[in-house]
A protein has these predicted regions:
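Intrinsically disordered, low-complexity, repeat-rich regions
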Residues: 1-93, 100-178
Length: 178
């Protein structure tokens, strides 16, 4: 319906340009998420990433991202505070991760917005809705010029993905192949 012009989205708002926060507030007692070997995270946008903000699947994804040579950085998107997608339902979608892949050492050429889902949620109506929204977002990003997305996005690929607990690693391997 969107492509046949039977349905249109009307965007109303004041601020459309998401920027990563310059700092984050954490509880003084919060424990930091470290790599599996106990070392500090190296590719996270922030040095301190609170471990209690991750479920087990999200931790596994973060550790996986830490080991990727093509990764420029990854960011744990905080629910109800950071980047969100407003679809046709009342509540916004807050993806779990935003990360960038690169072909060079000093810039990135791909941006990924990723939502992870446990096995028990994979066939839910909410997950189906998120898949539909992410598919629309990916198609819209592909059809937009860098002038519409902003100069910083010139020649960048943007993909939105919902990854199931039992397939996230295989999908990320495909996405991050050189």
């Amino acid at each position: 319906m969107l492509y046949s012009d039977q349905m249109r989205f009307l965007v109303i708002g004041e601020k459309f340009d998401f920027t990563f926060p310059k700092s984050t507030k954490v509880k003084p007692t919060a424990k930091t998420l470290n790599r599996k070997d106990g070392q500090q995270l190296q590719l996270s946008l922030f040095e301190f990433v609170p471990e209690d903000e991750f479920n087990e699947t999200e931790k596994a994804v973060a550790w996986y991202l830490e080991g990727q040579k093509r990764l420029f950085f990854w960011y744990r998107n905080r629910s109800r505070r950071d980047y969100a997608i407003q679809g046709w339902r009342k509540h916004k979608i807050y993806p779990d991760f935003i990360f960038t892949a690169t072909g060079s050492e000093d810039d990135y050429d791909q941006v990924y917005i990723v939502e992870t889902k446990g096995i028990h949620l994979i066939d839910s109506k909410d997950t189906d809705y998120k898949r539909k929204m992410f598919s629309i977002c990916t198609k819209e990003a592909e059809s937009r010029s860098w002038a519409e997305l902003g100069p910083a996005m010139k020649s960048k690929v943007i993909r939105f993905e919902v990854l199931a607990e039992d397939e996230w690693e295989a999908k990320l391997n495909q996405m991050l192949q050189a």
